[in-house]
Amino acid sequence: MLHYAVVFFIIALIAAVFGFGGIAASAAGIAKILFFVFVVLAVASFLFGLIRKG
């Protein structure tokens, strides 16, 4: 599960670069939404991983 948390976090960072950096202005809205979705998924995966190991 920790692996998925890292993957989701990396995807969130990539979405943030596109959304907040102005690189792709036409996709900025979608990238901002994806950033928050993947941050939530990363946190959820991290918490589930901690619960399973605990």
Swiss-Prot record:
Q: What is its main location?
A: membrane
Mark the transmembrane ranges.
5-25, 30-50
Q: Where in the cell is it found?
A: Cell membrane
Q: Which InterPro entries match?
A: DUF1328 (IPR009760)
Q: How does the protein's chain sit in the membrane according to the entry?
A: Multi-pass membrane protein
Signal peptide span per the entry?
Answer: none
Q: Which UniProt keywords apply?
A: Cell membrane, Membrane, Transmembrane, Transmembrane helix
Say which species the protein is native to: Methylibium petroleiphilum (strain ATCC BAA-1232 / LMG 22953 / PM1)
Can the keyword Transmembrane be found in this entry's annotation? yes
Under which name does UniProt file this protein? UPF0391 membrane protein Mpe_A2904
The Gene Ontology CC terms held by the record are:
plasma membrane
Pfam families xref list? DUF1328 (PF07043)
Question: Can you tell me which family this protein belongs to?
Answer: Belongs to the UPF0391 family.
